[in-house]
């Protein structure tokens, strides 16, 4: 556990930073998503080397899954429905959570985002439809909810 503590702090700090940054600006910059991705792979290399292949597949699945959604929507509607920062952030979360947790993480993030959007509609009315809803904060919250499996695999 003591070896994993710096990684836990790193993960929590960068996920919190990304969630807040995306909520304020609508952006998930590479300077935050890339270190989070490499940190997840390094965590598995040092603390759980037997899970490193699952972490690599998690990063690939996270990136590939959201990239398909991004490009499919963009080609169909000629505009972005999902930012490319979200694609890279899910790749980073995949590196931390491994591929098995990603479906639950994405489902939770989508449900949280729907709930947040519903609250925004109730509070602001139709003006909530004008600005796009950042998805990064919901990915961050879902990552924290499912994160117990990453840092406490035996518990």
From Swiss-Prot:
Protein name as catalogued: Leader peptidase HopD
Xref: Pfam families: Peptidase_A24
GO molecular function: aspartic-type endopeptidase activity
Organism: Salmonella typhimurium (strain LT2 / SGSC1412 / ATCC 700720)
A cellular component term, taken from the record's GO annotations: membrane
Similarity comment: Belongs to the peptidase A24 family.
């Amino acid at each position: 556990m003591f070896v994993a503590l710096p990684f836990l702090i790193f993960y929590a700090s960068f996920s919190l930073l990304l969630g807040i940054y995306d909520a304020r600006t609508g952006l998930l910059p590479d300077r935050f998503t890339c270190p989070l991705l490499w940190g997840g792979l390094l965590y598995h290399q040092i603390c759980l080397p037997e899970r490193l292949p699952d972490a690599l597949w998690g990063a690939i699945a996270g990136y590939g899954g959201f990239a398909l959604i991004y490009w499919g929507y963009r080609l169909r509607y000629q505009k972005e429905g999902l930012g490319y920062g979200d694609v890279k952030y899910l790749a980073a979360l995949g590196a931390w959570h491994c591929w098995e947790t990603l479906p639950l993480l994405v489902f939770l993030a989508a449900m949280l985002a729907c709930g947040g959007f519903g609250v925004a509609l109730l509070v602001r009315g139709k003006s909530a439809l004008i600005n796009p809803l950042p998805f990064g904060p919901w990915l961050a919250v879902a990552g924290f909810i499912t994160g117990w499996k990453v840092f406490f695999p035996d518990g």
